[in-house]
Amino acid sequence: MADLKVTQIKSSIGAKKNQRDSLRTLGLRGIRKSVVREDNPQNRGLINVVRHLVTVEEV
């Protein structure tokens, strides 16, 4: 499977608790911070919860 580069583009201020928790679980701690994660159903689910706060690229 490919890897996914996830970049936070919007602040988590005002987001619901489960959305903030999903960002932390992905390893994102601020705007314009990026992480590379394996492309699997668990990570896709976390990304889906915060899809309005992040961008995703295949690496």
Swiss-Prot record:
GO terms for molecular function: structural constituent of ribosome. One of its GO terms (cellular component) is cytosolic large ribosomal subunit. Pfam families: Ribosomal_L30. GO terms for biological process: translation. The keyword Transferase does not apply. Belongs to the universal ribosomal protein uL30 family. Part of the 50S ribosomal subunit. This is Large ribosomal subunit protein uL30. It comes from Nocardia farcinica (strain IFM 10152). The lineage of its organism: Bacteria, Bacillati, Actinomycetota, Actinomycetes, Mycobacteriales.
